[in-house]
Structure formats: C-alpha cells, structure tokens
C-alpha cells in the first residue's frame, strides 16, 4: 500500500476532532464550488463535481452544506482559487505531489516550501516528480458490496485497468480516458462508490525504514493540515509495525 493510502487510513482510524472536521468540510466545500464553477453545477454531468460530492458524503458533510457550496458557484459570488500542483522530495528521497486550491499563491508556496525544508526534503519544479506517477481514476467500494471475483469481472467488462481487493474494500483503477465510463458502469451495478476520483498513482513504491517513515508521515500531516492543500500523494511504503504505532 502506498504511503499516501497508509496515511489516510491512519487519519481515519484516529477519528476527527471538531476542528479537524470543520477544516475537512471547508476543503470539501472549496472543491465542490471550484468544480461547479469550472463545469456544470449538475453532478450527474460533471465528473469532478460528482467526485467531490461523493467525498463530502463519505465525510458526513450535511446536505445543506453541499448544496450551499454549489449555489455559491452558480451565484458567482465565490472567491477565485488557483489550482496548483507542487512537487518535491521528502525525507529519504521519496517523491511527493501536493494538490492545492489557493487564493494566495505566494502564501501557499512559502508555507509548503517550509514544510518540505523542515522535514529534510526540498520542493522542486512542476514536473520534477510527476513522471514517476500515473494520472489514474480510482473507484472504491466497501468489501461487502461484492465478492472479489464479481468486482473483477464487472471492472474488466467496464474497461478498467486493474482491481485490488482486500478486507478493506475494492479499488478499481481506470485510465483518465475511461474513468467516467467505468465509474458509471460500476455504479449501475453496485451503487454509489465510497470514492471516485482522479489521483496520482505511483508507478513504483519505495520501502523506507521506520525513522524515515515517521518523518514522512509528519510531513504529510503538516501538508494536509494546511487550508489550501486538497490532496497529497507519495511513493513510499512503511512496515506494518509503524502503521500500528502511528494509528495507536
């Protein structure tokens, strides 16, 4: 399991305090508004907006909040956010991609550069590490939604590239070009997924020792806590022992 997936699992197990929950809702609302502003305000016709709405539902964001974020885009009274991708190397030379929506480029760049530097890494230029990742669609379902064989058969029939099934659920991967069609076909068969989004999937992962792993998780925690940061991806793996320690 790639480091960013391990990190998200740890954060989920730890649960969210009210302040963290509020920050999560704020980030989700920002993504919903931007997605609705860039495309149609109808989630059925706007894959990015649909992905954002699904993510919001998974976080138990109130329906009123979701609708308000969409209406904000329609009304034209929303702030203007720039979409920026930051790339760099974290501790141990691990490649890291940060996706942000910001209304202040200088502030965001300064903050994110500081996080990388303090962790022992360095922020690079756009394109410096993204060649080590694939821009891929992922559709996730809970394990109880289908057997591994049924999910695999349905995914292949829909045109997916790969399927990973475990006790934690099913992950279906599809190219950018086929993502929307695959997601639509699976939803017709299994219902709404718990996640459907475009991600940066590492082509290969690097196993790091526990000391480096802790530094990387700390870097990712700082990045994720920043108001402008939407997603963080990295190409590392850590031991099960460190996973258990960080989740404890």
From Swiss-Prot:
Region: Disordered, residue numbers: 1-22
GO BP: regulation of DNA-templated transcription
Cellular component GO terms, alphabetical: cytosol
GO molecular-function terms, A-Z: DNA binding
A Pfam family of this chain: TACO1_YebC_N
UniProt keywords, alphabetically: Cytoplasm, DNA-binding, Transcription, Transcription regulation
Family annotation (InterPro entries): Integrase-like_N, TACO1_YebC-like_2nd/3rd_dom, TACO1_YebC_N, Transcrip_reg_TACO1-like, Transcrip_reg_TACO1-like_dom3, YebC-like
UniProt-annotated location(s): Cytoplasm
Family statement: Belongs to the TACO1 family.
Name used for this protein in its record: Probable transcriptional regulatory protein RPD_4171
Organism: Rhodopseudomonas palustris (strain BisB5)
């Amino acid at each position: 399991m790639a480091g960013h997936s391990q990190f998200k699992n740890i954060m989920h197990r730890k649960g969210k305090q009210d302040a963290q929950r509020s920050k999560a809702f704020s980030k989700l609302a920002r993504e919903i508004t931007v997605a609705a502003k860039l495309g149609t305000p109808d989630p059925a016709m706007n894959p990015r907006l649909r992905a954002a709405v699904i993510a919001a539902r998974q976080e138990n964001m109130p329906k009123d909040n979701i609708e308000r974020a969409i209406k904000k885009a329609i009304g034209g009274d929303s702030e203007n956010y720039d979409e920026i991708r930051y790339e760099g190397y974290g501790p141990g030379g691990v490649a890291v991609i940060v996706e942000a929506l910001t209304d202040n480029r200088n502030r965001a760049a300064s903050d994110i550069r500081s996080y990388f530097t303090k962790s022992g890494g360095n922020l690079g230029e756009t394109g410096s590490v993204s060649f080590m990742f694939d821009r891929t669609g992922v559709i996730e379902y809970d394990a109880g939604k289908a057997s591994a064989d049924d999910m695999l058969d349905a995914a292949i029939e829909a045109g997916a590239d790969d399927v990973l099934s475990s006790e934690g659920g099913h992950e279906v991967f599809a190219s950018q070009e086929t993502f929307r069609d695959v997601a639509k076909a699976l939803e017709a068969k299994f219902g709404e997924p718990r996640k459907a989004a475009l991600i940066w999937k590492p082509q290969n992962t690097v196993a790091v020792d526990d000391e480096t792993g802790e530094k990387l998780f700390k870097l990712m925690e700082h990045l994720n806590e920043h108001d402008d940061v939407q997603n963080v991806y990295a190409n590392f793996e850590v031991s099960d022992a460190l996973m258990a320690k960080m989740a404890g």
